[in-house]
């Protein structure tokens, strides 16, 4: 997810609104459980006392869970594709992702894909460090065809909370608001004043499978 997020960052995750039936929206950064096979060769780090306590009271995903963080690019019913040297296209509308993908990356030159129709109740996710991310593109052989069930989503990452000098919100990039994408506005996802009370500070270093490709490591 670099440069949007850096290794060691902690993010606040809105875990409240999914309880009321809200679903992930295009452009959001979400934390989700391993759908199965995405982190199969990753070993769990030993949780510290603070992490165990936060997990116990519900302010943080369980240390035993395998969680990932990616950006939602397409939702159920969408058609998404990306050809070599081209942009990511959702429902026929090209995304301008220069504002959030890693500098020097291309939208998908390392792994072109599609067109793919995302099943209802599932999402297609991609990392912002496109040439260094094991995302939906690399799991199309698994059940779900690389998509993630909405039921696996822990919540939306809304703020980089730590370290202090990196504090920043994580808004949805404007390119996902283009009329042609036909984004559905889910009012339940709007953060109420009390929503942050059930947010968890998720350390991005907990579960992170690294991809080795031509001498590069993944994040």
Language-model-detected regions and their locations in the chain:
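Soluble "head" domains of membrane/secretory-pathway proteins
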Residues: 3, 7-219
């Amino acid at each position: 997810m670099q440069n949007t997020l850096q290794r060691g960052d902690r993010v606040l995750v809105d875990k409240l609104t999914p309880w009321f039936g809200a679903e992930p929206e295009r452009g959001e950064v979400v934390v989700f459980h391993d759908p199965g096979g995405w982190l199969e060769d990753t070993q769990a780090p030993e949780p510290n006392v603070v992490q165990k306590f936060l997990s116990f009271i519900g302010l943080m995903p369980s240390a035993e869970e395998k969680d990932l963080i990616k950006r939602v690019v397409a939702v159920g019913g969408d058609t998404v594709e990306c050809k070599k040297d081209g942009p990511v296209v959702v429902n026929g509308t090209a995304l301008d992702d220069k504002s959030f993908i890693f500098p020097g990356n291309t939208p998908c030159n390392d792994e072109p894909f599609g067109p793919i129709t995302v099943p209802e109740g599932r999402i297609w996710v991609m990392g912002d460090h496109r040439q260094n991310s094991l995302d939906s593109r690399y799991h199309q052989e698994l059940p779900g065809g690389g998509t993630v069930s909405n039921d696996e989503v822990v919540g939306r990452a809304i703020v980089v909370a730590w370290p202090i000098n990196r504090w920043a919100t994580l808004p949805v990039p404007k390119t996902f608001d283009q009329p042609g994408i036909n984004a559905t506005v889910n009012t339940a996802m709007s953060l109420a004043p009390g929503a942050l009370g059930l947010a968890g500070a998720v350390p991005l270093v907990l579960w992170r499978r690294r991809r080795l490709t031509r001498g590069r490591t993944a994040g």
